[in-house]
């Protein structure tokens, strides 16, 4: 891990560095160094370098593939960010986090993408766009914590969550601390649609989530 930190004061920089240190220890990732500047607006850039013998692409889905969600439903809204950031990680042990982080390598699905600030729907749009396919998601199949507004859950940062795509019935990730469910299908039609239990489809994301179309 390499980081570059800008902070208006040493106190703020120490808080940021402390958070990076705690996260690195929990995940078992060494911090090799970086750059720190005081007296500037707050900014943080982190670069992670790794190696794998079997990389799983973010754009490997094919038409007809199952789209699955693996998500840790444990936790609560991050204070001050209700409806936007779900915190499932700060109360997990390092062993739990490392086990979750190894799921994709063990399952080796055709495609995988961690659910980011774009939320479940937005991340599905990025996976579909990179794969030159579309996606139809079934909201009633999407695992969600009890009592959480479903619209918030579809669009928030959900802590640990991973979208995967694979041939039907293959590549399902399993974990005692996370739920995995098939939530949709990769389609020929670009973009992301929600297929509701009554059969109605609604457009949820356009085909150009990032504008970085393959080819």
Explain the meaning of each model-derived region.
Residues 1-79, 185:
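Glycine-rich anion-binding loops of enzyme active sites
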Residues 8, 90-159:
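Active-site-proximal betaalpha loop/short-helix elements
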Residues 28-35, 108-115, 134-140, 179-186:
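Flexible, glycine/charged-enriched surface loops at secondary-structure junctions
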Residues 47, 158-169, 183:
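Short cationic amphipathic helices and targeting signals
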Residues 55, 168-175:
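Short, conserved charged micro-motifs
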Residues 77-96:
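Short, compositionally biased
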Residues 129, 154-158, 174-177, 186-188:
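A structural signal for short secondary-structure junctions
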Residues 176-215:
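Acidic, Ser/Thr/Pro-rich beta/coil linker or hinge segments at domain junctions
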